[in-house]
């Protein structure tokens, strides 16, 4: 399956009591699709997966699948640092009708490369769906090596990688050595254009909550051969891309959505709301986008 070029790692909306708000989920899905999203990643890092209970994740998967109704791929974040739990959640997500699976590198346990290979292989074995690997060493401590990614890419239903280690040399090595059917996605909004320039398929984006149409414009300009226009857009969008990460994700993107008039609630502990200074900075960045 082709997941598309601009995928959104969707926030999880909460109500005033901190419960998952499925009505807001529906509205958010429609908002994102109307603003250029070609695929939705549900219950990933941006969706606060570590603080969601399994029943909440399953309710999210089911709701998003129903609302999307096959318009774009729905990718379920089923990864954790417990291989058995991840595989079982993958089976349940598959039964709910999602289109793909995303699994993060196991955090805290600090597994070896061999351990990570076995972890992802077990998750892939639990489903017939395409699986996206997710490498984010800043959060998980371990870094999935290019060699291990290449080895995993030959498992038939491991078809893509969300790469968030920020290392373009590493990305080149992965793209060079994996099959043409295996796609690399930037896991950092600010590296979208550099990653595209070395052969990445697209981006799994947080900023697309706020600048979805502009992200699509940049993607289309690059793919259409207008690299100069794509570069101009990249430079224009870079401040908001960076600004959304001045506090632990998804703190700032939820605040930015609220500033723009779409309240998706707060974040769950141990995350805390942004400071007044952070909110003011986000307000400034959003206002700058309007006038630029």
From Swiss-Prot:
Its EC number is 4.3.3.7. PANTHER family: 4-HYDROXY-2-OXOGLUTARATE ALDOLASE, MITOCHONDRIAL (PTHR12128:SF66), DIHYDRODIPICOLINATE SYNTHASE (PTHR12128). The active site is at 134 (proton donor/acceptor), 162 (schiff-base intermediate with substrate). It is found in: Cytoplasm. It comes from Halalkalibacterium halodurans (strain ATCC BAA-125 / DSM 18197 / FERM 7344 / JCM 9153 / C-125). The lineage of its organism: Bacteria, Bacillati, Bacillota, Bacilli, Bacillales. Homotetramer; dimer of dimers. It comes from the Bacteria. This is 4-hydroxy-tetrahydrodipicolinate synthase 2. Pathway: Amino-acid biosynthesis; L-lysine biosynthesis via DAP pathway; (S)-tetrahydrodipicolinate from L-aspartate: step 3/4. Pyruvate binds at residues 46, 204. Keywords: Amino-acid biosynthesis, Cytoplasm, Diaminopimelate biosynthesis, Lyase, Lysine biosynthesis, Schiff base.
